[in-house]
């Protein structure tokens, strides 16, 4: 037996007991006759005391260094009051060592384990097995385990079945590029790794498994924008004989109970707000707004139709918008800060930023545009934006998509500057009534906003043939603190409707049969009404753990270039393997 207890287990009630611990040397302090070692495992830290009364153990303690793997036997004793460490769960006791054995020595680690070292992330990823020893990483992975376990227990109690679906599937054009796997047994043919189990879970509904879930691994060969990973984990769910409210109510109950169990210190407003897609875009410029703060967009377009200011007027005459954000109490912002905000909206596509400062002393307004307005127009803007002395008004004029993108960036930037987003608040909300399709100007065709299996709203079905851009979907996104936490929809369950949507998306009958024939045929054998959702596990745990990226809550993540620095994947393979697969590599020129 290597250990009788863990390093986080011993308490004053164990005083006088002979115990055996095993773990890593966290810290070592040598005072000659006395050597103190903090012994660590994932459960905690115990202080071990080596003294010359036990010379063999003391000699071992003289040789060990940080991260040695050590086994220690000794007697638990109460620490003197002045030596109690309130920062440790075991801080009231210590272990007086009588025997010690080095189970494995260790080289000097390239990163600090006992504290955050500030090293480059690439070093952490290369030595991930060392980085994972750190308290922060252990805390995150334990939280992840608790989240997944809670979900499994909750859904089991709700009558769901956890069913595994294949990893090797058929390649179909669902969105991002597939990861392809060549078939040795069928030369020239390929499997794909699933971007999601979307079609398979719908087929499970056809099969009669009315409540399905899976902690599903998903793969997308896409450009690694911002905080993405080529492989990720989602809670995949599907239910039969449900409408949108049934799905939303279940998920809301689950996430409310989850958060109150695993992060009880966080504030969780309930019930979750519900906003239509149109309302979210109008008020926040985003379909995943952070609702922990205000800074809502204010539409000024109708006030400025006849304005003599040509910048605003030309935009409005070309179908654009004029919208602004009131930054309360920000009249003190310097010109340098306003220039920085201008760069923020330019990153969203805007050509510039109009601004006005309402001084606190009742003095003259400073503005980049007010002097160009007609009498009364600036006063109308101030009234519409409910501005007060000491406020800063920030306005963008452009086409609606640019106004939304740029003011969304501005809103988030202001919230960060003003520290408006409470990290201890979890603000969930539902975004509903998405458009079913959007026009792809480059390809001159309609694209599905979510995926081609999303059902249109019944009351909009008549518009499919005449005005598809106005058709709303039975789709919904769960958002959390400015992130999309999960997306779902009620699905199409009739072959004729599915074929109509394929046709709208420019998928011919031949293509539909080749790519989705199994789905279309299944719908002819009694497919029930069904719907589901797929919240992302990585993103959820990242937010609950107050981490900046999903890499901090994954055991072995890849870089933004999809490289595993620890194992050097991807890597070349043996020529023999390529021959077996009938593959020849043609390098790009």
Swiss-Prot record:
One of its GO terms (molecular function) is nucleic acid binding. This is Aspartate--tRNA(Asp/Asn) ligase. It holds the Pfam family tRNA-synt_2. It catalyses: tRNA(Asx) + L-aspartate + ATP = L-aspartyl-tRNA(Asx) + AMP + diphosphate. One of its GO terms (biological process) is aspartyl-tRNA aminoacylation. Aspartyl-tRNA synthetase with relaxed tRNA specificity since it is able to aspartylate not only its cognate tRNA(Asp) but also tRNA(Asn). Reaction proceeds in two steps: L-aspartate is first activated by ATP to form Asp-AMP and then transferred to the acceptor end of tRNA(Asp/Asn). NCBIfam families: aspS_bact (TIGR00459), PRK00476.1 (NF001750). L-aspartate binds at residues 174, 220, 450, 491. ATP binds at residues 220-222, 229, 484, 536-539. Its main location: cytoplasm. One of its GO terms (cellular component) is cytoplasm. Keywords: Aminoacyl-tRNA synthetase, ATP-binding, Cytoplasm, Ligase, Nucleotide-binding, Protein biosynthesis.
